[in-house]
Amino acid sequence: PSYRDVIQLRAMDFTTTAVDAPALTGVRVPGEQLGGAEAFRRWVGSEVIPFLRDQYRVSEMTFVGHSFSALFGVHVLFESPSMFDHYLLASPSVWWDDQVMFRREQERYDSGQGLKAHVFMSKGELETDELSPHQDFHDQLASRNYEGLNLHWQVFPKETHLSVAPVALSHGLRTLHSTR
């Protein structure tokens, strides 16, 4: 597949709503090719996880995502938090669709639902909050005091949106799996 194909498939599976995507990656993706996160979540839950549990000895499941895939992780966290035991969300694209995930979190909170999950969120120091307000999203989650939510936050010095991924992966996995 071409670079364009990969970007389009990634955007389809990881975005939560079907709105026109800005050409941040150099590839413009029309809205009708977006918003497949819920279908992708159902497929992961009904096909991928059962396959993994059938084929391998799995005791814990950790979701790892960066950027759009971390946006998908936030969606899974709100829709079915018990799908994974741990969530590593590096630079989630919470800017998506005029910050729709802020509203989804507010709806979850207003409904009185809990949020039992172990979450590591992070961003690179050199990422601008205008593009993705990671700190604000973390602060909104942290302010709720959800029973059972174990939330970690890390800003990595001198890291950009792209360079933060490997650092967040290493640090996040150690953080999530050292608190058992």
Kindly label every feature range from the protein language model:
Residues 1-180:
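Non-catalytic cap/lid and distal C-terminal segments of serine-dependent acyl enzymes
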